[in-house]
Amino acid sequence: MPRIKRGNVAVKRRKKILKRAKGFRGTHSKLFRVANQQVMKALRYAYVGRKRKKREFRSLWITRINAAARLNGTKYSSVIHSLKESKIAINRKMLAQMAVADPDSFVKVLSSAKAS
């Protein structure tokens, strides 16, 4: 029975890990064992980071909407409440964008929400 040669598979696996570890400092990008640990850790951080990014952007949008609302004499919570009451379906991202880029249209949306 011939022996099983799997050298090329192992080499490919190691090369894949070392390629992902490119840019890491010191032996973290040179030695396979250390690089493998660091790549796994980096992937965990990347996964968590993708979740945190959504949280952080939502809080940024809320802060921007609140700041623009207070310039117009109201609060964030009352703005959101009046938008829901008047059935104006506009998300926080768009509201924040309007508040920063086009304050006049933001004021119009606020007034139409209050009027309804």
Curated annotation (Swiss-Prot):
Highest taxon listed in the record's lineage: Eukaryota
A GO molecular-function annotation: rRNA binding
Record's keyword terms, sorted: Chloroplast, Plastid, Ribonucleoprotein, Ribosomal protein, RNA-binding, rRNA-binding
SUPFAM superfamilies named among the record's database cross-references: Ribosomal protein L20
PANTHER family for this protein: 39S RIBOSOMAL PROTEIN L20
Stored Gene3D superfamilies: 6.10.160.10, Ribosomal protein L20
The protein, known as: Large ribosomal subunit protein bL20c
Gene Ontology terms: biological process: ribosomal large subunit assembly; translation
Subcellular compartments: Plastid, Chloroplast
Signal sequence, renumbered to the chain: none
Gene from which this protein is expressed: rpl20
InterPro entries membership: Ribosomal_bL20, RIBOSOMAL_L20_CS, Ribosomal_protein_bL20_C
Protein role: Binds directly to 23S ribosomal RNA and is necessary for the in vitro assembly process of the 50S ribosomal subunit. It is not involved in the protein synthesizing functions of that subunit.
Pfam (any one): Ribosomal_L20
Species of origin: Rhodomonas salina
Family indicated by similarity: Belongs to the bacterial ribosomal protein bL20 family.
A GO term from the CC aspect: chloroplast
